[in-house]
């Protein structure tokens, strides 16, 4: 099934054929065009990579993309997270157990902040090895209105970042996730554009508004 032409499966079995092809290839892609309503106490995204990723910079690109994807879902749910976790699965040739790590954070749904948390966990745990699967999860939610402001915080800068994030979300909601991409989306290791072109109406898990 994994080696079948997905277009033939689609023409023969419809959407069910495409779903079978995705599952056979270890890909879990959910259509999230509709506003997300969380049913669980965690939001996450995982993907099986199309090849082994051995360079740290390439893995970082994937981690950044997934951190952003789940951050979008978090804002759609009008929540902030207080716990960030990651998981890295290695290639069969590595004969190694997967790596897991998590950390407690100040309540946030800011993309850049969450990317930094995810990369911090990655740098603490990963030393070497061919990575074949990646997962990013956020949990322990509070309402998006909840937050801490200290005397040392630049309130004006925080509000500026929130307005910018809101503007980016609005553009993507209107024109699709790929209407605004980071520069590293042009690199070979990136998966954002490739996943946006998946057939059968599937969109990259966590990419609200992806077209």
Language model: regions and residue ranges:
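Acidic, metal-coordinating catalytic segment for phosphate/diphosphate chemistry
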Residues: 100, 105-211
């Amino acid at each position: 099934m994994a080696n079948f032409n997905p277009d033939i499966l689609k023409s023969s079995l419809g959407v069910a054929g495409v779903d079978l092809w995705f599952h056979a290839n270890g890909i879990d892609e959910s259509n999230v065009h509709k506003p997300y309503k969380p049913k669980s106490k965690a939001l996450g995204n995982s993907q099986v990579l199309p090849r082994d990723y051995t360079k740290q910079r390439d893995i970082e690109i994937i981690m950044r993309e997934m951190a952003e994807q789940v951050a979008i879902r978090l804002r759609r749910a009008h929540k902030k997270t207080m716990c960030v976790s990651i998981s890295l699965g290695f290639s069969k040739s590595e004969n190694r157990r997967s790596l897991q790590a998590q950390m407690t954070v100040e309540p946030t749904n800011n993309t850049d902040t969450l990317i930094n948390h995810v990369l911090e966990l990655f740098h603490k745990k990963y030393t070497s090895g061919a990575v074949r699967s990646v997962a990013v999860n956020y949990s322990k939610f509070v309402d998006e209105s909840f937050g801490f402001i200290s005397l040392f915080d630049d309130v004006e800068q925080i509000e500026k970042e929130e307005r910018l994030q809101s503007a980016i979300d609005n553009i993507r909601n209107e024109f699709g996730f790929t209407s605004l991409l980071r520069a590293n989306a042009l690199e070979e290791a990136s998966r954002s554009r490739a996943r946006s072109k998946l057939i059968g109406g599937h969109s990259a898990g966590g990419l609200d508004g992806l077209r």
